[in-house]
């Protein structure tokens, strides 16, 4: 599949209004009143996208220049190279070799790449990399066990996670379109970590943070009850630390 130089524009008059392509959706909708099990089974050896543009606007909602707005999305210069080896109701196996785009809020994704394999029991991500103008985040591996999950609370508390963040550089200014307070944080933080546990109870068994030559932290950290702010607490152990 190759998509070069395309523009895809979605629009609503109000949040409750139908999309401007609703007539297309209706045309392909099944007329059968008896619901049938969807049997999706797709494979794309190669999906190439270049110079793509995508927009989504809800006309009744205010625009917020310089700040990301989910009601006014404007993506330019979308490029991607993807291999979808399997996609069906039970599993997914995909390789995003490279994806990049610019968003009108000022957010720029220079590169996204990853391998993902998932089924009903687990999901495994390998060689995840995100590059922003001054950020390079690398996750060597990430795995979540979904075998005991039957609800959202179970996902938060009963889905074991294993995560490895290889040495990375984070610049909070790159995220300022989402969090305007980060606009003045132009310095880079070096980060690496090894973590496991659950979404709601996270154990950073190895954490290294370095800020230029002004700050260094090496240690461990536990975050408990993350989704319950009134009950959240942090327990840490410092192996080495200095601030100048």
In which residue ranges do the predicted regions lie?
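Solvent-exposed loop/turn segments connecting transmembrane beta-strands
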Residues: 102-108, 131-138, 210-218
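Transmembrane beta-strand segments that form the barrel wall of outer-membrane beta-barrel proteins
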Residues: 95-99, 122-130, 201-209
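Transmembrane beta-barrel domains of outer membrane proteins
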Residues: 41, 117, 194-196, 220
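N-terminal beta-strand/beta-hairpin edge segment
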Residues: 1-7, 97-100, 112-114, 127-128
């Amino acid at each position: 599949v190759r998509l070069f130089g395309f523009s895809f524009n979605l629009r609503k008059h109000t949040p409750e209004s139908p999309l401007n392509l609703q007539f297309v959706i209706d045309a392909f909708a099944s007329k059968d009143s008896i619901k049938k099990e969807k049997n999706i089974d797709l494979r794309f050896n190669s999906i190439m996208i270049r110079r793509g543009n995508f927009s989504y606007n809800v006309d009744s909602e205010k625009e917020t220049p310089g700040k990301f707005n989910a009601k006014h999305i404007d993506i330019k210069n979308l490029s991607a190279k993807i291999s979808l080896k399997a996609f069906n109701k039970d599993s997914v196996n995909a390789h995003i070799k490279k994806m990049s785009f610019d968003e009108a809020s000022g957010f720029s994704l220079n590169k996204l790449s990853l391998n993902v394999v998932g089924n009903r029991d687990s999901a495994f991500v390998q060689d995840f990399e995100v590059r922003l103008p001054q950020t390079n985040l690398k996750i060597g591996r990430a795995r979540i066990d979904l075998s005991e999950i039957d609800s959202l609370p179970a996902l938060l508390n009963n889905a074991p996670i294993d995560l490895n963040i290889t040495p990375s550089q984070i610049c909070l200014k790159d995220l300022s379109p989402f969090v305007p307070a980060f606009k003045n944080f132009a310095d880079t933080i070096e980060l690496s970590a090894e973590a496991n546990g659950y979404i709601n109870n996270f154990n950073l068994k190895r954490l290294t943070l370095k800020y230029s030559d002004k700050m260094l932290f090496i240690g461990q950290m536990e975050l408990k009850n993350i989704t319950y702010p009134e009950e959240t607490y942090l327990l840490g152990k410092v192996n080495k630390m200095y601030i100048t």
